[in-house]
């Protein structure tokens, strides 16, 4: 039954977006935006990262051996891209194999090949690890074949051609030129995979809070995807410890226990072990490590819509980082977004289509929102977020 509900939910979101796009087409402001031709309104690389790897004559060395690496190898096999070896950070080499390849040090491949292309297949925001990757890029071509955190649709040429109109519309809806520059870089990185693009578009997280989000002592913060309380802690710091209410939600039970432990001494704090979607009831949930936890699976947990979660409160700031359910949460939260117009921080990177579907949906729900985009230091382009005010 819960699978039927989940499918129905996705259909409802699709219908909602199509209905809203139809309405947008009727508005004079948006007619011009929708009159686009089958090309992007900004320049990107001529070849996708997959096409670059298919055409290269250099050996291809994979850096990383986790879940993302498995996904990339599967696509390599499908596209007949030849992999020549696998490497890892020095502490993770050891005597082991990955997908039939012995995991070797970078020095081993330097000596064996001299010149080669490196593909990054893991995620990190650790400064030392990121700096090491950027240093490697000074001597070798480093590409990042992006695979979505949730879903299987990659940002290749077919994907780009299928969604050109939506990408152009989302780009036009952004509130400022800086956000548009970041959007252009993000799309180019997802498509072309050049590591240096990330350096060009990254900003420290403090910048957006200092220039766009202004907190006061009356903030009611709703943290959807609160994890262990890291963003609660960050909010309190940014609000100088003065706020009205914090509501934190985390679907994973073990992580939720750490959340309530870390926040047990906070004043005016309420927490829920639940998933926020577009309906009230129950939904399947897969409790896996880190970013692999997601909606779908045999473990049934409580599901709440945003209006139900916020009943009795007037949210002023909502963070949504829900491993791929952002569209459903927003569509189910239309009442909240229209009634209170809370400031929002919405993850833009879980699914390939999030980068354009999310701003289109937000604008369709409440056209008064000014939508900003930022990418904070991370490889690949995770921690790319919409900030709406």
What residue spans do the PLM features occupy?
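Positively charged N-terminal leader segments that act as targeting/secretion signals
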Residues: 3-14, 20, 28
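Phosphate/nucleotide-binding beta-alpha loop and adjacent structural elements of enzyme active sites
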Residues: 24-83, 89-389
